[in-house]
Amino acid sequence: MKYIGAHVSAAGGLANAAIRAAEIDATAFALFTKNQRQWRAAPLTTQTIDEFKAACEKYHYTSAQILPHDSYLINLGHPVTEALEKSRDAFIDEMQRCEQLGLSLLNFHPGSHLMQISEEDCLARIAESINIALDKTQGVTAVIENTAGQGSNLGFKFEHLAAIIDGVEDKSRVGVCIDTCHAFAAGYDLRTPAECEKTFADFARIVGFKYLRGMHLNDAKSTFGSRVDRHHSLGEDNIGHDAFRWIMQDDRFDGIPLILETINPDIWAEEIAWLKAQQTEKAVA
C-alpha cells in the first residue's frame, strides 16, 4: 500500500499537522516538531504529546506513515568542532522529540564540508554524529535525505549515502529518503520510465532498497544535473508526470511515506488524488 501525503504545517500545535493532513485526504504526512529555523525550542509538554497522539489515532496515522524533518540549521558534518557539537546536540534533541511523540523516523539533510575538510572526512563525521544520536535514543530511525548538491552539501551521490550507512554501527536504525527533485538536479535522470529503471537500479546496487524509508515527490524547476534545488508542482516542469506514475506502480515504494514538498499547497489535495489514481492506471511502458 502506498502512503501518500505532504509536508504540512504544525502551526498552532503539533496535533494540527495530522488534522491538516486528513483535510487533504493524505495517507501520510511530514512535519517539523519544532521551529526549523531556530536552534532551541521549549520541551514538549505532556498535553502537546497527548494531543498529537490522539489526533494521529483519530485520523489513522501510524508512525510508519509520518516522516518528521529536522531543523535546517543542523550540519552533522560541520568541519568546526564547536559548531559540530552544537549540531549534534540539536539533532539528539530532535530524535528525542520524535521518541516522545511515538514517531519512528527522523528525516535530515546529511551535512556540508564548507570547503574546509574533505568529502571523506565530512561523511565520516556525519556517520559518527548518527552513531552518537542513536546511542542516546531508542526506537527512532535516522533517515538520510539525498541532496541536490548545492554549495558544499554532501548526499548528492548515492555513494555518499552508502558511505554514511557503512559508518553507522546500528544498521537497523538508519535509512534514506530519496527526493526526486534533488536526485534529478544531482544528475539522476527520471524523465522516462527507462531512466527511472536505470536510476533506481543504481540505487538498489549502491545503497539498497532495504534502506529506503521515505520519499519526497517533487518536480524540478532546476535543470538536469544543475546541482540546484528548486521544487515544482508534479508534472509542471523538468521531470514531468511519468516518473511519479512509475513510482506509484512499483511495489518497492509501498509502505513508506511518499511526501509532497511541491510549491503550491492549494493543490496538494489534487496532487494526492492524482497520485492515488496512478496506481490503477494502465502500466507505464
From Swiss-Prot:
EC number: 3.1.21.2
Cofactor annotation: Zn(2+)
Binding site for Zn(2+) 2: E145, D179, H216, E261
Cofactor: record remark: Binds 3 Zn(2+) ions.
GO terms, biological process: base-excision repair
InterPro entries referenced in this protein's UniProt entry, alphabetically: AP_endonuc_2, AP_endonuc_F2_Zn_BS, Xyl_isomerase-like_sf, Xyl_isomerase-like_TIM-brl
NCBIfam families from the UniProt entry: nfo, PRK01060.1-4
Family: Belongs to the AP endonuclease 2 family.
Protein name: Probable endonuclease 4
Source organism: Shigella boydii serotype 18 (strain CDC 3083-94 / BS512)
Gene name per UniProt: nfo
